[in-house]
């Protein structure tokens, strides 16, 4: 029911995580974020007192795809072969160089997507991680059958993936303890596939998220991704957001510290990146985040979205559609009134 309303939470925040400093060279500024009650880093960069995003930090093992179809094997490629010390040393160095304590604070986001810690979830452009892992075991045990090899590969991969993700998070929390830390895109919930009328996470996905309790118990914030595709039907876009937020809230309630659920939301469509979400899609997705128990929205964008023309278009979009909707959400929160749009 697209017209349903609900009482919002007492505390809810909307954040701006777009590198709009890039627009300053074109004399385009986004000072109106303040009047729309959107929290942002004053310099318009990815890292500051309000929120800080770290892309592929440190030296995680990774099979980095190259344009010629081959891979750059970084830190031995897969976690079970990688050197954790080298990774953590590099991460510490990066934090010291680009994120000194004097500017630290707010939300700290680790964005690593070269593999997923659940072996089965390494599909499509991540399937190379499964292939390499299976090949390593096959070379060690050429007489084992396929099932034994895959089971052993999965066990080795997941055990080591946990070490890398867990120790990275603990290090961040230890040396930048003013931040509220979490991994971008977790918990993962592939909901809006055609043929899934409920849009809830399936039992297998929920079970796999439960297996990641070792990660979530250390996260201060849960950061599910709720980017939508233009090709989806309106109810599928709504369902994707609803399912992802509900799953993150379910995970949050498993822990005494109740990590906040802040959904990463992109103003462009995943499959049509030069097109902003329509006013209806913004309203529908924001509403779902709010009324299904979310604690906030992180509006995201990339430098690829920003040349002079795109900066001006984004500013116009913020002023006419995105900002006013965000303001209405925040007014409903502050006044404790139902959200009606």
From Swiss-Prot:
Its EC number is 3.2.1.35. Gene3D superfamilies: Aldolase class I (3.20.20.70). It is found in: Secreted. Its main location: secreted. It comes from the Eukaryota. InterPro entries: Aldolase_TIM, Glycoside_hydrolase_SF, Hyaluronidase, Venom_Hyaluronidase. Pfam families: Glyco_hydro_56. Glycans are attached at residues 3, 68, 83. It catalyses: Random hydrolysis of (1->4)-linkages between N-acetyl-beta-D-glucosamine and D-glucuronate residues in hyaluronate. PANTHER family: HYALURONIDASE (PTHR11769:SF35). This is Hyaluronidase A.
């Amino acid at each position: 029911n697209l017209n349903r309303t609900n009482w919002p939470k007492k505390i809810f925040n909307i954040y701006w995580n777009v590198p709009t400093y890039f627009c300053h060279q074109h004399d385009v500024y986004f000072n109106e974020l303040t009047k729309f009650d959107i929290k942002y880093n004053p310099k318009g960069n990815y890292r500051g007192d309000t929120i800080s995003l770290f892309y592929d930090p440190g030296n995680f093992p990774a099979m980095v795809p190259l344009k010629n179809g081959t891979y750059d094997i970084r830190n031995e490629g897969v976690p079970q072969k990688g050197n954790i010390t080298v990774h953590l040393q590099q991460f510490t160095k990066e934090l010291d160089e680009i994120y000194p304590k004097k500017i630290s604070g707010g939300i700290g986001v680790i964005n690593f997507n070269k593999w997923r810690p659940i072996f089965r979830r390494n599909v499509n452009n991540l399937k190379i991680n499964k292939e390499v892992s299976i090949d390593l075991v096959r070379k060690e045990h050429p007489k084992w059958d396929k099932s034994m090899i895959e089971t052993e590969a999965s066990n080795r991969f997941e055990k080591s993936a946990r070490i890398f993700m867990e120790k990275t998070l603990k290090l961040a929390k230890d040396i930048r303890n003013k931040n509220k830390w979490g991994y971008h895109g977790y918990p993962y919930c592939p909901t809006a596939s055609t043929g899934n009328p409920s849009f809830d996470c399936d039992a297998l996905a929920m079970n796999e998220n439960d297996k990641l309790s070792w990660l979530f118990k250390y996260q201060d914030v849960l950061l599910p991704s709720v980017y939508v595709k233009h090709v989806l039907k309106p109810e599928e876009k709504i369902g994707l957001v609803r399912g992802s937020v509900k799953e993150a809230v379910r995970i949050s309630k498993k822990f005494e510290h109740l990590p906040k659920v802040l959904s990463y939301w992109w103003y462009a469509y995943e499959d049509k990146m030069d097109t902003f979400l329509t006013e209806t899609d913004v309203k529908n997705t924001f509403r779902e985040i709010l009324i299904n128990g979310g604690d906030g929205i992180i509006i995201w964008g990339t430098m690829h979205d920003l040349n002079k023309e795109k900066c001006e278009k984004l500013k116009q979009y913020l002023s006419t559609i995105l900002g006013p909707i965000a303001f209405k959400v925040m007014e409903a929160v502050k006044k404790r009134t139902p959200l009606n749009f």
